[in-house]
Amino acid sequence: MMKIIAMLFVVFSGTLATANAQTTVSDADKAAITQTALDYLEGWYAADGERMEKALHPELAKRIVRTNAEGQSRLDQMGAMTLVQYTRRGGGKNTPRDKQQKDVTILDVFGNTASVKAVAADWIDYLHVAKSNGKWVIVNVLWEMKPKKE
């Protein structure tokens, strides 16, 4: 009986150590994830298409659920190149520098994936970030406009 208990203890301890090793995130990865989100936000405000593009996976899907006056919802989406083109057009430059909110919070990281909350002046983004070819890039964005201030 003691052998079984000892063996279970060893197996359980090894499982915990493996799980812990997989969930440990390096400071370098945390910094790279944060920088990716900042490239996205700051690239928008600066109308810097190259910086925006650097932050995005080429197959990015950016989505928002919009609800019309009748209460019917639809899903609108754009891809990476559309977002880069909007960035280059300079829409972000309409936000005064002192109003440019750029709050980044890493919500979770596991292996080569991360979830990040990015708060901008007019909207909140939930980013899915992945390490692709050694570089952290945004793969998915689900976003919502902030209510208009009166």
PLM region spans:
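Short, low-complexity N-terminal intrinsically disordered segments enriched in polar/charged residues
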Residues: 19-50, 54, 58
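Short beta-strand edge/turn micro-motifs at domain boundaries
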Residues: 115, 124-149
